[in-house]
Regions:
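Non-catalytic cap/lid and distal C-terminal segments of serine-dependent acyl enzymes
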Residues: 3-259
Length: 259
């Protein structure tokens, strides 16, 4: 809890929140360890707000994406903007159940219910997104829980088309990769994301661009609509901060349309 408190002080004192409230707390994670969370409530929050779950990238933490650009974009999204929860997911969990812990279960059974209860959020209007490692996690978790989310999205999703291409530590072994191969799932399933509006963006110089494009192509081949964007830039904070406004506009509309 002290860690969460430190996070909220940093978020509020060093960043212009545009009237939003940043709140830190902890929920039990894999192995019962307390995992810090950062939730952000817009200045004009609804009584039963929608919820956006945003998963961080490798080597980041729950406060990494709560930048000035994020807060400005949240304010610009207007009165229907969602509350946002940024959970901590470890250094390189890749947000799935594996030998190091049940990271996927932690999100679904810990992070989301705790945020809904604390924020009095609408349990039916929930979206999930993330960047890099978190972008993979968002598409993987939504695939494994079809119908749970109104929107699914990723910035610069850390995806690979073959197990031999993956980053060290991303998966336990080849079988683990195959169980969580979202591109193959999109190619073999009619629609792994029923009822969800899909977002995916990637930079022109991002090494994940080919794999992200493969995911978008696989979805479109199946007749699944996906808002896919390739914008100038690489796999870095400058790129991600440049597109917060577009991302939050998309999810605000997706959640408003979900009833």
């Amino acid at each position: 809890m002290l860690v969460a408190g430190a996070i909220i002080v940093k978020a509020v004192t060093e960043t212009n929140t545009h009237g939003a409230r940043a709140i830190g707390y902890a929920v039990p994670g894999p192995g019962g360890k307390a995992m810090p969370q950062l939730v952000v409530v817009p200045a004009h929050a609804a009584r039963r707000p929608p919820l956006l779950v945003f998963l961080h990238g490798k080597g980041q933490d729950q406060s990494s994406s709560a930048t000035s650009a994020f807060y400005a974009a949240l304010a610009a999204a207007g009165p229907e903007a969602p509350d946002v929860v940024f959970p901590y997911g470890g250094e390189d969990s890749y947000w799935h159940n594996r030998e190091t812990g049940d990271w996927g279960r932690y999100v679904m059974d810990g992070v989301i219910p705790a945020a809904i209860k604390r924020l009095h959020a609408d349990s039916h209007r929930v979206a999930i997104a993330g960047l890099s490692m978190g972008g993979f996690g968002a598409y993987d978790l939504a695939r494994l829980h079809p119908g749970r989310f109104c929107g699914v999205g990723a910035d610069s999703a850390a995806l690979w088309r073959q197990g031999g291409e993956t980053a060290t530590g991303a998966f336990d072994n080849g079988e683990d990769f195959e169980r969580h191969n979202v591109i193959e799932a999109a190619q073999s399933s009619t629609n792994p994301y029923p009822g969800a509006r899909l977002w995916l963006d990637v930079g022109t110089e991002d090494p994940f661009r080919p794999a992200d494009t493969s995911l978008a192509d696989a979805l479109r081949t199946k007749g699944v609509a996906v808002s896919f964007h390739v914008w100038p830039g690489g796999h870095d904070e400058s790129y991600w901060n440049s597109h917060w406004a577009a991302v939050l506009r998309f999810f605000t509309k997706a959640l408003a349309a979900c009833r």
